[in-house]
């Protein structure tokens, strides 16, 4: 007998602990979710700069690499945020000067067993920038977007 396929709202149905019912979570020894282990391999790739700085060949696979040898695609961070669950994500962008943009990302996370505050969601904020000095020529046209993406990634990564 095959398992019933989950559709629509059931994909995001949560249990009494705030965890998605259809996800097999990995946990740390202290009982917290091992969010790093929850990132699918399809969202990981070798950190070319790490290998170049050590004059090593960049591997073609992420298998066996340590966290410092890996980078996570934006899609992996987005998936983690959806898995963790949030109420809102808000951005505030400031064009400080020509070629210098800052972004603040604020996420109101849903309550779960890791952050139980009596029915109150937890809020986390982080900031990032994008400048002509820390992006390439192509990206210079998208400083606001890059700053927002960086702030979002920091917000998710540093909260989890």
Model-derived features: where do they sit?
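Glycine-rich anion-binding surface patch
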Residues: 1-160
């Amino acid at each position: 007998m095959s398992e019933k396929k989950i559709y629509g709202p059931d994909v995001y149905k949560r249990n009494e602990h705030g965890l998605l019912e259809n996800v097999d979570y990995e946990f740390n020894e202290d009982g917290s979710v091992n969010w790093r282990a929850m990132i699918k391999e399809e969202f990981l790739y070798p950190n070319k700069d790490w290998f170049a700085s050590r004059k090593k060949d960049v591997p073609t696979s992420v298998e066996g690499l340590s966290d410092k040898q890996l980078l996570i695609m934006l899609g992996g961070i987005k998936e983690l945020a959806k898995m963790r669950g949030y109420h809102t994500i808000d951005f505030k962008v400031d064009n400080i000067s020509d070629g210098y943009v800052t972004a603040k990302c604020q996420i109101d996370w849903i309550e779960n067993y890791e952050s139980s505050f009596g029915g109150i969601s937890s809020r986390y904020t982080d900031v990032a920038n994008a400048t002509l000095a820390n992006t390439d020529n192509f990206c210079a046209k998208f400083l606001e977007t890059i700053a927002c993406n960086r702030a979002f990634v920091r917000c998710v990564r540093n909260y989890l």
